[in-house]
C-alpha cells in the first residue's frame, strides 16, 4: 500500500501544481478583460447598463458603478477608478476642462430634458418663470439648457433671490419630491422622472428645451486616454459591445422596456412612464465635435462649469472606435 501511495501523492501534487499554474496563467487574462464602467440611473442610460448582460459573449467583463450625477463619474475617472463612463455632454466638458484625461468616443442617447411646472403655478411658457423658483441639478446639461432658455427669453437668474428667476439646486432624485411638495414652481428634469411627474398629475410640461443652439443634447460615452491608447484591443471589444447593446435596445423596444423597468428601476416606473421617457430621450450612437463645441461655447457664454480653459472639441472627440464598431457589426444603423 505504501508503495502505491508514493506515486499517487506525487501525481496529485503535480496535478495541484498544474492547477495552480493554470489559474495563475488564466487570471491575468481574465483581469485584462475587465472594463470599469461608470453609469447613472436614468431610462436613457439603460442600454449602457445592458452592456454588462451581453459582455460575456463580447469576450469582456463589465464592472458597473452607478453614480448620482455625471460630475461624480468624472471625479472617479480622475481618481483612476474607471475606464469608461456615461454622462451628459456638460459633465464631460467640465471634466475635461478640470483635468479628466478623457475622450468622447460615442453618444448613447439624445434629448432627455423637460421643463415641468406645478399645475397651479401658472407657468405656460418660459417667460412665465419670472418671479418663480426653479429646481435644477447643478452640473448637468439641464442647467445649461435652463440658462440658455431663460437668456433667450430675456430673464436673469441666480441661486439667490433678487433676479427674475431663482435657481434651487437639488439632486435629480429630489426634484420631483420638491415639486410635489410645492417647494418649487418648476423643475428642469431628466427622464423618466419628468414623465413620472406629468403622469402622476403633479407636473405639466412647459417645454422640451431643444430650441437653443445646442438642439437635443447628446449624452456622451467617455473613455480614458490611457484605455483608448494603451488597451486598444479591449477598447475595440467594448465599443462593439456598446453598439450591439444600443442596437438591441433600439430594435427591441419590449426588451428595453422590461430591462429598464424591472432590472434598473425595480418596477418603480410604469409602461407609460417608460414610453414617454424614451419618446423624449431616444437611444443613439452618434456624436460630433460640432455638437460638443456648441455645447462648450454655450457653457462659456453663461458661465456654467466656470472653466479656466474650455477644451476644444476636435482635440478630444474621437469617434474612430465607434465607426469601426458600427462597420464590424454590419454597417450600423
Regions from the PLM with identified roles:
Residues 1-16:
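Bacterial N-terminal signal peptides that target proteins for export
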Residues 32-169, 181, 185-191, 202-208, ...:
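Short, glycine-/small- and polar/acidic-enriched structural segments
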Residues 89-91, 161-164, 168, 173-262:
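Pocket-lining segment of extracytoplasmic ligand-binding domains
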Residues 45-52, 74, 89-92, 126, ...:
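Extracytoplasmic/secreted envelope proteins and their assembly/folding machinery
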Residues 23-31:
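Sec/Tat signal peptide C-region and signal peptidase I cleavage site
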Residues 57-59, 211-213, 281-288:
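Short, solvent-exposed loop/beta-turn-alpha elements that line the ligand-binding surface or hinge
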Residues 300-333:
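Conserved C-terminal helix/tail region of periplasmic/extracytoplasmic solute-binding proteins
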Residues 229-308:
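Secondary-structure end/capping motifs
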